[in-house]
Amino acid sequence: MTTPIAKSTRRIVAVVPAAGIGSRMQMDKPKQYLHIHGKTILEHTLSVLLGYPLIEKIILAVAANDPYISTCPLLTHPKIQLVEGGSSRADSVLNGLNAVKSAVQNSEDFWVMVHDAARPCLTHQDLDKLVQVEDQNGAILAIPATDTIKRALHNQQIHYTEDRSQLWLAQTPQFFPIATLAQALEQALAQGLQVTDEASAMEFAGFRPHLVAGRSDNIKVTRPEDFALAEFYLSRTK
């Protein structure tokens, strides 16, 4: 499955799933609405994507009863479109993909970057590397594992040590042809498969996405300690 796609014919959109509640942050609001340097994490994330010239449109998937999204000043940007999120990340992403497919005549020309709402430290340099991938397998940003990784037993004792030389930590954006990813997600959901990211759906469908080495500061704000780190990384770009 290595059909080349000419980069000159591709059109790129972004889908940002932002319907989660972020319970691990132990805050009174979803993590994407926490403020860093006067802007929400979501605003930082959207600003990076809006500033990348190859992205034509950003589909933002939010919860139907989201009480915070109306305060986002970027909602009036002509490139941003809201869609209702689903009960899972995969459902939210699929809703975003379907919104694109229903709005264009030929979705075969479109590729999508799916990016976490709570990953605000993305750089355009990493996006430049990601868009170099040309075949239907697509690609994801990722970093090689550097820590020693242990496989655990059910009682949290060590079972054995993994060979980290072949292990990578997945990041986002994850970059795929829209039609191919939509089909892969639909198949995975229909089969009840655990889809933790878009690449896993593509893997279930028989594709082998490329790993593009990203930056270690492209962190996802998931736990309270991540907040201070993101605050530091974002302070360098002010």
Curated annotation (Swiss-Prot):
GO terms for molecular function: 2-C-methyl-D-erythritol 4-phosphate cytidylyltransferase activity. Its EC number is 2.7.7.60. Pathway: Isoprenoid biosynthesis; isopentenyl diphosphate biosynthesis via DXP pathway; isopentenyl diphosphate from 1-deoxy-D-xylulose 5-phosphate: step 2/6. The record marks R164, K220 as: Positions MEP for the nucleophilic attack. The record marks R24, K31 as: Transition state stabilizer. GO terms for biological process: isopentenyl diphosphate biosynthetic process, methylerythritol 4-phosphate pathway. Gene3D superfamilies: Spore Coat Polysaccharide Biosynthesis Protein SpsA, Chain A. InterPro entries: IspD, IspD/TarI, IspD/TarI_cytidylyltransf_bact, ISPD_synthase_CS, Nucleotide-diphossugar_trans. Keywords: Isoprene biosynthesis, Nucleotidyltransferase, Transferase. It comes from the Bacteria. It catalyses: 2-C-methyl-D-erythritol 4-phosphate + CTP + H(+) = 4-CDP-2-C-methyl-D-erythritol + diphosphate. Catalyzes the formation of 4-diphosphocytidyl-2-C-methyl-D-erythritol from CTP and 2-C-methyl-D-erythritol 4-phosphate (MEP). Belongs to the IspD/TarI cytidylyltransferase family. IspD subfamily. This is 2-C-methyl-D-erythritol 4-phosphate cytidylyltransferase.
